[in-house]
């Protein structure tokens, strides 16, 4: 087992990474204050791991809360089901909410914990690659709104993150690829050697090689922890973690939540960010193509939806959380391994990026 730390002073917490951690209650016990635990999961993950985790937490009074699965259910109605369960079971302020599942479950369970009786403890137990390397670390919680993704939520840090890498053995290939989009992001924005490592190890990752996956998770979490420790509430540096997300969130919102997986939309959005970075003269064509190839090798879509026009993108991006004073800030690459958050671009460059023929770009690789 490996242990990392998210350094936030008195609110610091550990990230445990290893095999079989779901069966080690001694890892969670120090982070559970009371006798009540609510495990929030979904209809897909619960049959696989809920009984196992409940057994490990047998010393506590365990309440299972099983939600419908999918991004389409990341809303107020589903959030109320968590509150219904907690209130019906008379859970008090010393309860601990445990999020067992992917990013949707982590975001909603964390938001419920932030709100319930004005805040109770919670623990992240992510079971997808995307949630293990990204959404479980950093305290972003929330739900979607019909007009925009993750527009209702709170910064609320967990007490611990427990990553059992064996859970990836039950992950569908499409979900694994979606998680790799976030892994690749770290190489692009802040770790050029990691980018080269990913190029050398992509096939091992897709084949679920345990050593390769553990290393990718460790390096991704270390990068995320360092950024969160320096900028918890996304006032500057942390926003660079959103490479590809502004374009990607527009895709998710327009196509309907869940039609494109989050990681798939981020991948296509990252291609657009690479294209715009090249048009600004910050990276060259070979570097743009290198990024696209790596996303392709991960089994990800690299062409935005053909039915989305530049006007569609602009409509949805206008609701992005990085808009300040009416000006859209984008995360782009100043160079490979270095990202910036900027509004220093012309409308012409943005329009050219939105109008680019990505099918033709990919065809020439």
From Swiss-Prot:
It is found in: Cytoplasm. Gene3D superfamilies: 3.40.50.1970, Dehydroquinate synthase-like - alpha domain (1.20.1090.10). One of its GO terms (molecular function) is 3-dehydroquinate synthase activity. It comes from the Bacteria. Its cofactor is NAD(+); Co(2+); Zn(2+). Pathway: Metabolic intermediate biosynthesis; chorismate biosynthesis; chorismate from D-erythrose 4-phosphate and phosphoenolpyruvate: step 2/7. Pfam families: DHQ_synthase, DHQS_C. Keywords: Amino-acid biosynthesis, Aromatic amino acid biosynthesis, Cobalt, Cytoplasm, Lyase, Metal-binding, NAD, Nucleotide-binding, Zinc. NAD(+) binds at residues 69-74, 103-107, 127-128, 140, 149. This is 3-dehydroquinate synthase. It comes from Pseudomonas putida (strain ATCC 47054 / DSM 6125 / CFBP 8728 / NCIMB 11950 / KT2440). The lineage of its organism: Bacteria, Pseudomonadati, Pseudomonadota, Gammaproteobacteria, Pseudomonadales.
């Amino acid at each position: 087992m490996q242990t990392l730390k998210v350094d936030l002073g008195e609110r610091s917490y550990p990230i445990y990474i290893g095999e079989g951690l779901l069966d080690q209650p001694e890892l969670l016990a120090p982070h559970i204050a009371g006798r009540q635990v609510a495990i929030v999961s979904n209809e897909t993950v619960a049959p696989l791991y809920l009984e196992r985790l409940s057994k490990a937490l047998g010393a506590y009074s365990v309440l299972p809360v099983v939600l419908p699965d999918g991004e389409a259910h990341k809303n107020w109605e589903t959030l109320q089901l968590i509150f219904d369960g907690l209130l019906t079971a008379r859970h008090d302020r010393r309860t601990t909410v445990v999020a067992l599942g992917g990013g949707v479950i982590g975001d909603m369970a964390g938001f419920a914990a932030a709100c319930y009786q004005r805040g109770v403890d919670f623990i992240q137990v992510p079971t997808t690659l995307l949630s293990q390397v990204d959404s479980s670390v950093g305290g972003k919680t929330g739900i979607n709104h019909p007009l925009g993704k993750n527009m209702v939520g709170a910064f609320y840090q967990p007490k611990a993150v427990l990553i059992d890498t064996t859970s990836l053995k039950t992950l569908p290939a499409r979900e694994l690829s979606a998680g790799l989009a976030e892994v690749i992001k770290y190489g692009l924005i802040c770790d050029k050697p990691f980018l080269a490592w990913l190029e050398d190890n992509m096939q091992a990752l897709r084949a679920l090689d345990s050593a390769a996956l553990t290393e990718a998770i460790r390096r991704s979490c270390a990068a995320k922890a360092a950024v969160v420790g320096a900028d918890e509430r996304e006032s500057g540096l942390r926003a660079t973690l959103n490479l590809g997300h502004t374009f990607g969130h527009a895709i998710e919102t327009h196509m309907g939540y869940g039609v494109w997986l989050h990681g798939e939309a981020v991948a296509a959005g990252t291609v657009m960010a690479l294209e715009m970075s090249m048009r600004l003269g910050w990276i060259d064509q070979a570097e743009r193509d290198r990024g696209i190839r790596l996303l392709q090798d991960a089994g990800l879509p690299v062409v935005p939806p053909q039915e989305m026009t530049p006007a569609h993108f602009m409509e949805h991006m206008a609701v992005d959380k990085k808009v300040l004073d009416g000006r859209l800030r984008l995360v782009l690459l100043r160079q490979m391994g270095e990202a910036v958050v900027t509004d220093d671009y012309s409308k012409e460059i943005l329009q050219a990026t939105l109008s680019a023929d990505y099918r033709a770009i990919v065809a020439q690789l």
